[in-house]
Amino acid sequence: TSPPFILLGGKPIAEPETDKEEQFIQPQRGNYVSIIDAALVESGMANDWLETISIGSYVWAESQGRRPIIYHEKNVETSSPNMANLIVATGRIVELINAELTMESADEFVETCLQHDIGKLTIRASLDPKIQPKLQGSFDRQLTRRHGSREAFLLRNPKGENYLICVKN
C-alpha cells in the first residue's frame, strides 16, 4: 500500500463571515432581543435572513457560541414554522437587574418578575450546571404559585454585568 496523500494549503470551504460585527450598546427597557439559532449563524447566512424578516435595524450583541443574540427595534412575528425554528427565543426587555444570579439573589429576580405579571421565567444564560437546575426550580415554584400571566426568559447581557428579563412575544 502507498502512504496517504496529504494536501496542504488552499482556502477554507467557507470564508468566515465578517459582517456580523458585535457592538457594545447598553440594552434598555422596551428594546427587543432575540436569540438566533446557532447553526444559522455558523452557516454564514444569518444576516441575509435577518434582512428578510422586517425587524428594522438590529445590532449583534453576541455572534459566537450557543446563544447568538441580537437587539432590534421591531417585534419578530414567530407564527410561521420556519421563523420559529430559526429564532430560539424573542421578547421585549422589561427589566435590567444589576445583580449576580445566585440562590441568594433568586428572590430579587422573582420579585421583579411579579412586578411585571410574569408567571414563568426560563433561564437562557450560561450558569454552573450544579446551580442552574436549582435556580430554575426555585423560579418555577415561586412564580407558579403567584399566577402571573406572562412568560419571560432571562439573559445575561453579553457585554455587561447585568441580566435582562425579557417578556416573550
Descriptions of predicted regions:
Residues T1-N169:
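Class I S-adenosyl-L-methionine
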